[in-house]
Each structure stands twice: as structure tokens, then as C-alpha cells.
Amino acid sequence: MLKNFFKKKEKEDTNNKNVLIIALLIHAAKIDENYTEDEKKIIKKTIMELNKISSNQADELLKLAEKKEEESNQIVEFTKEIKKYSMEFKLKIIEIIWKIVYSDGTSDNYESNLIRRICGLLYISDKDNGIIKTNVKNLLK
């Protein structure tokens, strides 16, 4: 019985971490006040790939994260979880955010500023951010 408790607790902790990370992606998608279906698709695909879960499970996490994003008023809450991961993972998150931003073909000042702030909180250099941004732009052409 105790073993089941810890397994359940571990699963809840993992879901909470995922929800915070996904909420950051949603926040990036909403920053231009235009949360599109294309952005949702990118986020959902990311959820499924990173967590190796089904479409239905991804939908559940997406709903939880959307609620979390609506309740929060600062990105620090979302980035504090990502700080615990490797630099490689952090860079991957920035890449995903740029893909979300450029899903509509352009980037505005609010989106660029948000990504700069996220990079600062995650200790990602302007150089690395610029390289990722350029790579994503070239990939989506």
C-alpha cells in the first residue's frame, strides 16, 4: 500500500512539472493575444513527443496547463521548474517556443521580449537564443 502511495505521488509530481512547462508554452502562444489552433497543435505534439503519451492524455495535460496559465500572472512560476533540467532541455524548450511564435509567420515585440526574459531566467545566452531563433526561422521557410 505504501509503495502505491509513492508511485501515485511520483506521478502527480511529474504531471505538475509537465503542467508548469506546458503552461509556459501556452503563455508564449497567448502573449500576442492570438492563441491559434496551429499553436495548440504544436504544443500538443510537443507534449506527446516529450512524454510519450497518447492524444487523450495530452489533451488532459493541455487543459490543466491552460487553467494553470490563466491563474498565474508571472513566468517565474513556470521557469523555476525548467531550471532544474539540463541546458539541452532548456534550449529545446526555447526552440519549441520559437516554433510556436513563428507558427503565424511572424514575431512581434511582445513575443521577442518574452523569450528574452525566459532566456534570462534559464541562463541561456543571447547568442544561443539568436542561433535557435535563426534555425527555427530557416526551418519554417
Kindly label every feature range from the protein language model.
Residues 1-141:
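Small-residue-enriched hydrophobic alpha-helices in membranes
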